Amino acid sequence: MLRLEAEWLGERMARIPDNDLFPLLDLGSSTLEYRTQTQPYIERNIFAPLRARGGIVYHLDVKPEPGVDIVGNLEDPAFRARVSRMQVRSVLMSSLLHYLHSYSQVCDMVTSLLPAGGYLFVSGPFSHPHDADPIDTMFRPSIEEIHRCFPGTRMLDSAIIDGGNWRNWDAAERGGRSLERTVLRLLTPFYRPEKWWQVARQSPYIFRHLTATAVVLVKDEQSPF
């Protein structure tokens, strides 16, 4: 997630009353370390303000790691039924669609978890290099494409967020690497070549801008899900 993407999402959540927002399900949450140390702006802009409001947030991921409240896969019907019983009012689904081979099926499942009037916050890369964590389908949807992934919803807000290039990012967005260190790494392809390819794929963004798509959707009363 980009820093400005986290800020945008946090600002939109702040506008929604507690009774309409909570409980919130953070789908594909990753770990506490990732949210607070690897990308601390996620905690700062999204989850710390939500916690200050006293709302319930469930972090769901397939990884049984610290900071994951619910471990499982929504493609498992029994697990999906368990999550449905939690009666969440909103879902955050960030940086997840491009990891899914059957994203349309998962999107239908996510919509089915929400009541009519429930909120869905969706964001992900628009212009971004390949991210093999563990896979990347290179799905880089526009605003309209994201909306079409969730039939039975209407759009409340949307943006293409310009995260700038390498020179504009903070240390967390650079993965802890300085520009000088990155240039030096590009000069040593013979050392750990798999890691070198990761850096090489990102190198155009020393000049090009990373962008993200973000939308806020609400489930219709007449939704088929």
PLM ranges: what are they?
Residues 22-132, 147, 217:
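Conserved SAM-binding loop
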Residues 1-21:
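Class I SAM-dependent methyltransferase Rossmann-like catalytic core
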